[in-house]
């Protein structure tokens, strides 16, 4: 290792098949951790301990701002330049309640070095000291377009946090943390409270950076297969050597334990047309020890699953049986110094508070006294051990997730970065404790005898959002009225100057400071598909031959093309309830235990694939994952789930419908962009209309009716479930997907044949499902403070064809045109677009303060494309960034899913290669030629917006109909 650092400790980490090193930089005291192994998806992170001292959101605003240009990379937005021209597998930055982290990842050596270089320069030498407009753009500013116009606030983080605070769940989480840890930095909002963000001054902003963004307060992490010495040398010679060690007081005292349980009451907004009945959130919250206790950290995760999260978990079941709220959720945040545990009753009556607490405490006391059934504990253990060992984090690199988890201990003890990663020994210790009453004692110590608890009640209040908006408007008006004529003119001028600086492009010289890898460094060929066809028991098998480390991934896919549209919502509901209702041989709690003990999970889902213009393939999928040795038990459980589930338990069905109802509400408020985009596409796309019926606003309205009129709807629901199951589970509909390499599909022959025997007899199939699209433009009013603005169309309906160049255009739009117009100038948190090879296409914004302005941006998008101009270097960057987004690393199970989808979409490797070749050869002229496609999409005039009721009312001319959705 480099001689500028001292190795504090070296240890083997078998869980990551590598060696961990704890180092300290001699000159500055910077903390460094290296995990060296053979993973080619390399990760770098630099983090800082950033405890907030108020609610202005300065840690969050700074996280955005340091990525807006630096000493060596002075262009306006190096982050965007990296996204556009990098093969990164991860590139982002995150603000937590007590730390700010800047991670990057890439499999390409040159690319990885560039990412590390840009990020180090950004955090240590940002342009914020010479460009005050960065704070205005990313944080907040006064916006005054003319002397007569109303004064408003704008800024990316300001609008992002308005969106966050529009979600009752997010609001509650923040109140809970503050209620328990009010005398620590956790009592403040690190992301920023929209009410307090405008209190942040430029001086406070710079002072925060000067104080905390110093090597002596830094946590640097390198992971993967790389020349570690080369990186340590670079980090020292380019950055750390220029600093001296500094005493930085970024630590804090723990919250003193309470002597008695506290109660907190707050309010959240609901729409003017909404009822306030049964909309109260009740929560029971406790501080759970210390995050440096590795055994407790993992042990309480297991306990939470046993008591609340597993199907049929006893304490949750007791609360559901008493009809406390529509759903019961638990959360365990162990990513802070003093972990916080919460039990939340969603949408309860406000008179149920005492009953909620009484049932909770009585059941906890009963379990602590009588003991936890050993099979329940064993199931929770197996669930977490499988999860930890499989280590499939989806699109997030393994090294990234391990690095983030490291901060859960490293931030509070320099010598303990690995304690939450080295889980094998902890699992062993915890297993030994099963018979010793350890878990029962956790209940006593932290949930019964612990006074460091709060009861937080959050009640609905009609018109509260309007009151907040009016208070903000009044405050701004009073401020404007207090200004002299000259001061008002100055504000108008400052607004113009900010807009002008946002319009101003970085110079060619600035842009060329970031090295770009060569096109030659990019793999030319697509990753191969693997669909080896065979048969078992007369059913087609698709074998995806990828190495899975002794785990078999099996999907039983059933074609639903013939299931009529009126049964589709019931089929969607069937997918939700399988595995969480009683069966012939098990209660749903027992079934959950068996699934966790014998497999890595069993689930049901619906999948819809767009196969051609106005054509789609719906599928009902049962899937499991297990060790090869457990395949018989896995199929026994699949049979139990598919053929023995009790679909007529009235009480249980109502509980599940209530849970789905609340979850769909959360989806509409927190990911409204997805709902708005799909709804806009459903006006013309049968594929999107079908998706609407199973997961969109249409499904929300269906579930709402089921819940509110449950007694009248019950018979229809049961009949619909049974009828859908009969039509789905037929042999003629079935295809098996198997991902694994260690065994051929023959290893499960007997199990498959036994499953087939349980299927319903094949019936004569009716005609293919028909979906009717209804052309409309809709505004959905909510009590939220921001908008999700969508428009959509199908360019193939206009006689235009798909080309891989559209993938490059998507990159250009997302990080050039839409980024500048919607995010930089408009202040929205996000903006995106997509163009499918079936023609369905959309534009949508995310946490957007605007509405009409965003539609104008879409209207002018085709002109931007027609006039598109970029030099060859920029074009190369767009191509590299596009390929990077196409080439994200995938686990074996994801490669199997990719092959499975390609098969049913009729895509060959040659088809995929053609698109890749079109991306790699894309020219400026190819982009300009796409203007008619963009024009066709926008001019199709399919609009949908989910947003603030007042904003929608002010812009109702954009819509044929305005509805109140929540």
What are the language-model segments listed below?
Residues 58, 62-66, 574:
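Active-site His/Glu-centered metal-binding helix of metallohydrolases
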Residues 144-217, 221-239, 243-271, 276-278, ...:
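Hydrophobic, small-residue-rich alpha-helical packing segments that form membrane-like cores
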Residues 1-43:
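Non-catalytic terminal extensions that flank enzyme cores
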Residues 90, 206-210, 269-272, 315, ...:
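Generic recognition of flexible, low-complexity loop/linker segments
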């Amino acid at each position: 290792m480099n001689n500028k650092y001292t190795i504090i400790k070296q240890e083997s980490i078998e869980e990551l098949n590598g060696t961990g090193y704890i180092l300290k930089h001699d000159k500055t005291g910077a903390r460094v951790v290296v995990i060296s192994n053979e993973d080619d998806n390399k990760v770098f992170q630099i983090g800082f301990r950033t405890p907030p001292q108020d609610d202005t959101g300065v840690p969050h605003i700074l996280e955005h701002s340091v990525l807006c240009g630096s000493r060596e990379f002075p262009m306006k937005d190096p982050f965007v330049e990296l996204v556009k021209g990098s093969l990164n597998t991860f590139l982002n930055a995150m603000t937590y309640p007590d730390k700010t982290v800047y991670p990057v990842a890439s499999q390409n050596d040159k690319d990885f070095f560039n990412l590390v270089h840009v990020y180090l320069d950004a955090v240590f030498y940002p342009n914020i000291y010479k460009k005050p407009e960065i704070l205005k753009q990313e944080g907040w500013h006064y916006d005054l377009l003319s002397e007569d116009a109303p004064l408003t606030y704008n800024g990316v983080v300001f609008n992002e946090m308005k969106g966050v605070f529009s979600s009752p769940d997010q609001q509650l989480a923040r109140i809970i943390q503050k209620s328990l840890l009010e005398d620590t930095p956790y009592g403040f909002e690190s992301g920023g409270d929209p009410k307090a963000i405008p209190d942040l001054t430029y001086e406070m902003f710079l002072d925060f950076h000067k104080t905390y963004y110093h090597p002596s307060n830094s946590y640097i992490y390198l992971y993967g297969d790389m020349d570690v010495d080369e990186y340590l040398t670079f980090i020292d010679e380019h950055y750390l050597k220029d600093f001296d060690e500094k005493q930085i007081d970024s630590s804090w005292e723990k919250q003193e334990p309470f002597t008695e349980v506290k109660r907190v009451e707050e309010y959240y907004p609901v729409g003017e047309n909404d009822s306030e009945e049964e909309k109260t959130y009740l929560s029971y919250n406790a501080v759970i020890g210390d995050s440096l206790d590795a055994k407790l950290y993992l042990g309480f995760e297991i306990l939470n699953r046993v008591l609340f999260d597993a199907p049929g978990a006893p304490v949750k079941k007791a609360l559901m049986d008493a009809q406390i709220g529509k759903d019961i959720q638990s959360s365990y945040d162990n990513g802070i110094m003093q972990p916080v545990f919460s039990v939340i009753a969603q949408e309860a009556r406000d008179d149920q508070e005492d009953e909620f607490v009484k049932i909770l405490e009585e059941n906890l006391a009963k379990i602590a006294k009588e003991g936890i059934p050993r099979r329940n504990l064993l199931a929770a253990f197996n669930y977490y051990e499988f999860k930890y060992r499989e280590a499939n984090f989806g699109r997030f690199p393994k090294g990234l997730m391990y690095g983030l988890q490291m901060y859960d201990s490293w931030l509070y003890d320099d010598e303990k970065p690995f304690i939450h990663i080295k889980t094998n020994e902890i699992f062993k210790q915890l297993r030994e404790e099963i018979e010793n009453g350890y878990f029962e004692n956790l209940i006593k110590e932290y949930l019964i005898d612990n006074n460091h608890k709060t009861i937080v009640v959050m009640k609905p209040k009609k018109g509260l959002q309007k009151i907040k908006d009016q208070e903000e408007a009044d405050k701004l008006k009073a401020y404007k009225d207090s200004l002299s004529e000259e001061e008002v003119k100055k504000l108008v001028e400052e607004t113009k100057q900010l807009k002008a600086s946002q319009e101003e492009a970085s110079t060619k010289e600035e842009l060329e400071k970031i090295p770009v890898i060569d096109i030659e460094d990019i793999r030319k060929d697509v990753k191969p598909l693997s669909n080896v066809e065979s048969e078992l028991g007369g059913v087609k098998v698709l074998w995806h031959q990828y190495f899975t480390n002794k785990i078999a991934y099996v999907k039983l896919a059933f074609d639903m093309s013939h299931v009529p549209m009126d049964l589709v919502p019931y089929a969607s509901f069937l997918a939700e309830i399988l595995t969480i209702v009683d069966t012939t041989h098990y209660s749903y709690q027992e079934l959950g235990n068996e699934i966790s003990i014998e497999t890595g999970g069993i689930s049901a889902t619906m999948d819809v694939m767009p196969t051609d213009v106005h054509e789609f393939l719906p599928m009902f999928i049962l899937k499991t994952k297990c060790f090869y040795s457990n395949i018989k038990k896995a199929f026994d459980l699949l049979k139990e789930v598919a053929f023995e589930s009790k679909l007529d338990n009235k009480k249980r069905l109502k509980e599940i419908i209530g849970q789905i109802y609340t979850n769909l509400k959360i989806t509409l408020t927190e990911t409204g962009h997805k709902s708005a985009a799909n709804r806009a596409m459903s006006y013309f796309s049968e594929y999107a209309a079908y998706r609407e019926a199973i997961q969109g606003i249409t499904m929300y309205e269906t579930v709402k009716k089921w819940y509110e009129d449950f007694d009248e709807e019950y018979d229809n629901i049961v009949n619909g479930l049974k009828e859908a199951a009969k039509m789905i589970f037929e042999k003629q509909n079935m295809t098996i997907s198997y991902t694994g390499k260690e065994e051929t599909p023959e290893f499960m022959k007997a199990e498959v044949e036994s499953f087939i025997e349980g299927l319903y007899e094949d019936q004569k199939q009716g005609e293919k499902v028909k979906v009717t699209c209804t052309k409309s433009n809709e505004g959905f009013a909510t009590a939220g403070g921001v908008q999700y603005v969508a428009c959509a169309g199908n360019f193939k309906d206009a006689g235009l064809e798909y080309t891989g160049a559209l993938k490059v255009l998507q990159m250009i739009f997302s990080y050039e045109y839409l980024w500048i117009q919607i995010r930089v100038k408009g202040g929205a948190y996000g903006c995106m677009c997509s163009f499918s090879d079936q023609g369905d296409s959309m534009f949508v914004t995310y946490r957007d303060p605007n509405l009409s302005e965003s539609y104008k941006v879409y209207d002018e998008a085709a002109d931007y494309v027609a006039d598109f101009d970029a030099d060859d270097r920029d074009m190369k960057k767009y191509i590299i960034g596009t390929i990077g987004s196409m080439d994200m690393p995938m686990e074996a199970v994801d490669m199997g899913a990719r092959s499975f989808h390609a098969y049913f979409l009729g895509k060959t490797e040659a088809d995929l290669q053609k698109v890749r070749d079109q991306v790699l050869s894309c020219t400026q002229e190819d982009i300009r030629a796409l203007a008619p496609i963009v024009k066709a999409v926008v001019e199709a005039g399919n609009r949908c917006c989910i947003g603030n009721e007042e904003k929608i009312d002010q812009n109702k001319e954009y819509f044929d109909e305005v509805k109140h959705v929540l």
